[in-house]
Every structure is written in C-alpha cells, then in structure tokens.
Amino acid sequence: MLNSFQHLIVYVLNQINRFPLIGNKNKFSMKKRVTGIGGLFFKTKDPKAAKDWYKKHLGFNTDDYGCTFWWKDKEGKDCSTQWSPFAEDTKYYEPSKKDFMFNYRVENLKELLVTLKEEGVTIVGEMEEYDYGKFGWILDNDGNKIELWEPIDEAFK
C-alpha cells in the first residue's frame, strides 16, 4: 500500500509527460525561471528495496540512482526528470528536516541565484558545476531545501 507521499510521487511522474512545465511568463526580469521538474527525491529505510518495489509494481526502469524519465519540452528538446530514493540518514537535504526534496530545472542558474538572493531568498552553499549541469540550492518559505538544476541532458544519453 502506498503512503500519501508515494501517491504524490506517482501522480507527479504521471503528469510530467502530459503537462511539462514551461517557463513562467510573468513580470520578473528573467524570461524563465523554472522550466520543469528535474527530480523527486525522498528518504526511505532501504533505497534498494524501494527501487525494486517501484520496478516490480509500477514498471520503473531503475538503476543505481533511481529512475530517469524522458520527455520533450515545448521546443521538442529532450529533457529528463530523475526519481531517486535516498537513505533515511542522508544529510543531502539539510538544513531542511523534511524527508523529501524537489529539484527544479532552470535556465541561467547563475543569474537566477543572484536574482533570488536580491529578492531575499536564502541560498544554501555555492553553485556546483558538473558535466551534466549546474546545481544550486535554496530554502523556500517553509525551510524546505530546493535543488535548482541547469541541466545538460545530453550527458545522460
């Protein structure tokens, strides 16, 4: 039986291919901020057992990191969303005390972090850059850690 958080994960993952988020068209100085959901991360007692359960019962194509869902954005570009169970003792979500963390796909992460800081948003740590994209972290109004990702989707192909 799924708990409410697991129902949320399944619902969001089912919606990704149907209604991918397109950039916010608003009065902010940046044309786009969040362009989609980059990942859904949650704590579990046994990440391997969670991956096995989702593979067996829901057909997730899991690997060491979880499951990657591929979809296309408005322009037809390949995009990915990562689903990943983490060990319940992970420190990765800190300073948040929650059992989950959302990752949002963004454009121009460096500029976005500057803008968010100017708007009074708490920035957690320094931006990091890898061959699969740039990452930054913020806290929302409830103290939830949010991961921002400027992806290089081609690195996963």
Where are each of the predicted segments found?
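N-terminal amphipathic/hydrophobic targeting modules at extreme N-termini
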Residues: 1-2
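A cross-taxon signal for low-complexity, glycine/charged-rich
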Residues: 6, 20-24, 29
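Short hydrophobic targeting helices and cationic amphipathic motifs
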Residues: 6-8, 13-15
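Vicinal oxygen chelate
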Residues: 30-39, 65, 113-157
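Core segments of cupin and vicinal oxygen chelate
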Residues: 31-35, 41-84, 118
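Acidic di-acidic motifs
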Residues: 46, 108, 140
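Conserved short beta-strand elements that form part of the metal-binding/catalytic scaffold
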Residues: 59-97, 138-141, 145-152
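Mid-chain, well-packed structural core segment of small domains
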Residues: 95-116
